[in-house]
Structure formats: C-alpha cells, structure tokens
Amino acid sequence: MPKRSVVSLEKASVASSDKALVVSSDQAPVLSPDKALISEATPAWLKLKELTGARIALGRTGVSLPTKDILEFRMAHARARDAVHTALEIEPLFKALVGKGFAPVTVTSQAIDRHTFLLRPDLGRRLSVASAQTLTTLSHDTSGPLPSLAFVIADGLSAQAIQGHALQLLEALRVELPQVQEAAVVIATQARVALGDEIGEILGAELVVVLIGERPGLSAPDSMSAYLTWHPKVGRTDVERNCISNIRLEGLGYAESAQKLAWLIRQAKVLGKSGVDLKEESES
C-alpha cells in the first residue's frame, strides 16, 4: 500500500475520534438528584396507602427504594422473626383469664422446645403424654356434665398475637354468647391448630375453638385466627374446620370477630357440622 494512503487513513481515524469525543455542553445529560433520581407516589396511590398496611406507593431513588423504606422493611422482617421465636408468657395470661372468671388449664404439645416445634409440625399437633394424662384426669374428676364448648388458646407461630388479643376476643364473645363463661379453657404451648382436636376429644367437647397466632407477615406480626371444629377428634382435617383470620386492631376487630364466631358456634350446633358444610353468613 502506498505511504500516502497510510497517512490519509491515520488522519481520517484521528478526525473521526476527535469528532466522537466532542459533546457540546447543552447536549450533556443533567443528573439532578431532586428531579431525575427521586420519585414519590402520586396522590391516588397515597390515598390507597391509607387503607392498607401493605407495602405500596413507596416511591424510588434511582432504581432502588428510598432508604427510609428499606430500613422499615428490615425492621418489619425483624419483628416477624421475633414473633415466631418469642415464647408465650403463660403466667400473666393465666392470671388474666382467672381474673375474668375462667378456669384455665395449661398443656404442651410433643414438641419439647421452639426449635423442635418449627422443624416438626407433626409434633405440635399431638399432646405430650403428661398433658394428655392431665386432661384425662380432669375430664374424669369433673362433677356434673362436661362442657360442650372448649377454647384452646395456642401460641402457634405468634405468641405476640395471643398475648395481645386472646383475652380481649373472649370478653367480646362473652357478650354475644354468655355460655362462653362455662366453657373449658386450655392454654397450649408449641401448639398447631390440630392440637385442639385431641384436647376437645379428651374433654368430650361438642365443639372446640382454637385461638392461635398466625404466621407473621411483614406488616402483621400479631395477627390471630380462630378455628372452629365440630366434634373434635384426632384425624380431623382442615376441610372440617371454619376459620376467622386476621383478628387484630388493624384487621378484623374484636367485636366483629366475636359476632362472626358466635354465629358459627350457633349454626354448628344447629347443623351438627362445621367446615365446608357450614358457610359463614352472619350480617356483621
């Protein structure tokens, strides 16, 4: 190739590079933190946000969430973990129930500790040998007819929910259904829903209601559920239960929950069944 051709190519290359690097100031992108990187929720989203504790309308900073929302998410996650691992404070709950005229009994499942309870759900569904014997003795020693209704106050996956809502719901339910005062009340630890079946069977209860702490969510670490089962016995399945969930101040309030539960209890006795055969149609 002739020398002059090489020089011409080099000049053309340099000229092309210089042209590519030259950008006028009025063409350069402007990255303003106040305008380009930060975005807040619109008024419409903010109005929806007032109606729920769910994480909506968080806004953004660049491609991420604002620092405030990230920290709140981590705090919610920590609260949920604490709710799962925190033990139920039995003594204050026991005394509070006695103070309201109930006669509670305490039992535990076959899960010997929280670690076992979380890893072995099956053990949380059966009573320990000692607890089964305690209830058997109690059912034999009781003078007069056995209670037709039994309440099991179970820690489940959120002792915090039980600590905060169980007694309040029972008080509200007593207004709707005065015979609640005569019901058997059992406090159960390391307990799953199905533990109520064995408890109800041993006590000879017609109906068992299990008040249990729900699995914590990131916006609700203290949510409680009420499970109702007609003629409880070991082996009952979820299809034979009725459930009222999200019982808490920010969810379904005590009065409304009590109205629904009282309706279900009455209808279960009328129909002689619970679960999918009993549809909740109360007007509350």
PLM features per residue range, with description:
Residues 2, 34-130:
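Active-site loop/lid in soluble adenylation, ligation, and acyl-transfer enzymes
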Residues 5-9, 13-17, 21-25, 29-33:
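Ser/Thr/Pro-rich low-complexity tandem-repeat tracts
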Residues 80-95, 100-103, 165, 172-185, ...:
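Alpha/propeptide regions of enzymes that mature by internal proteolysis
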Residues 107, 188, 244:
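Hydrophobic residues at beta-strand termini and immediately following loops
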Residues 107-108, 152-154, 209-215, 229:
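Short beta-strand segments
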Residues 112-114, 159, 217, 235:
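Short, acidic Gly/Pro/Ser/Thr-rich loop/turn segments
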Residues 120, 125-139, 146-152, 156-208, ...:
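Conserved mixed alpha/beta catalytic, RNA-binding, or beta-rich assembly cores of soluble enzyme
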Residues 214-284:
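C-terminal functional extensions of proteins
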